[in-house]
Amino acid sequence: MAQVQYYGTGRRKKSTARVRLVPGTGNVTINGRDAQDYFPYETQLLILNQPLAATETQGTYDVLVNVDGGGFTGQAGAIRHGIARALLQADPEYRSTLKSEGYLTRDARMKERKKYGLKKARRAPQFSKR
């Protein structure tokens, strides 16, 4: 008996998340660990639960995630993007809700590259008049 699964890929900064939604009780597993153990801050847990809260599907799907690259904030954003795409696959009627909240939009902001002659992307060395 094949189990129904919905897939979504999310990206944010340097992070990529491959998300599977399986009908279940609402457990979130990230790279084989529980979400509360994986993320150090509560805000990241709130970020990844946003699409489920918007569509009122908390507790109806188990979320299985493989995420790599970037830091915790980028990974949380990538997971949110992936969950939103997977929910859209599960029920296309969620599109208007997810789109209006901005969860289907790929956040294109990236780290600006460092330029030569500068200390960071825009930070110039200290100016000395004499």
From Swiss-Prot:
Instruction: Please provide, in alphabetical order, the Gene Ontology terms of the cellular component aspect for this entry.
Output: cytosolic small ribosomal subunit
Q: Which PROSITE patterns match?
A: RIBOSOMAL_S9
UniProtKB keywords: Ribonucleoprotein, Ribosomal protein
- Extract the SUPFAM superfamilies matched here: Ribosomal protein S5 domain 2-like
Any Pfam family the entry gives: Ribosomal_S9
Q: Which GO terms describe its biological process?
A: translation
Single GO term (MF) = RNA binding
Name the protein family. Answer: Belongs to the universal ribosomal protein uS9 family.
What's the protein called, per UniProt? Small ribosomal subunit protein uS9
Instruction: Name the encoding gene, please.
Output: rpsI
